[in-house]
Amino acid sequence: MPDTESQTQDKWAQYPCTILEFAPPERLRIDLRRPLGAPERAILASLGLDRPFAVLTAENPMGENTEDEPTPVQQAESDQRNDARRGELEAELRKSGIEYQPCDGVAADGEYREHGVAVVLPREQAVMLARRFGQLAIFWFDGRSFSLVGAVARNPSEKLPKR
């Protein structure tokens, strides 16, 4: 079994291939492998996300989705833990009066999804929140483009799309 640092780096290498899916009312898919275009920017603006924001999740802390082919029982247990974590994150945001937009991170092949949120917070506050939920990284939008920013993982930030 690979060591924790190796697992972290394997996960980190996958993040730049993520598709961000924003929930209705404005269905939006942002492929982080491609530059952001005017249509995507317009929809982000309609969602109130035309300024810096973070995309983060509470699911699968430390990249814990290590089961390549979980049994139905393992999958049900994982789903239950993730539902509880997501509820805790959303409750914390609501209690703090912080608005959020549902936003899922999806593997490019569509085989993997983590439910998350897009939230307008200062970058360091978003990183601290992600760390509290055991997350390796967040996606950060600086008002122009996205970056991958380490939370628990201490990797240097990477502009997306990768060149």
Where do the model's predicted regions map?
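N-terminal, charge-rich interaction modules
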Residues: 1-91
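Mid-chain, well-packed structural core segment of small domains
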Residues: 94-122
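Short, compact, well-ordered microdomains
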Residues: 113-115, 119-147
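A generic "folded-domain core" signal
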Residues: 82, 141-146, 151-154
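Structural alpha-beta junctions
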Residues: 84-100, 134-136
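Short, low-order "capping/linker" segments at domain edges
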Residues: 120, 150-163
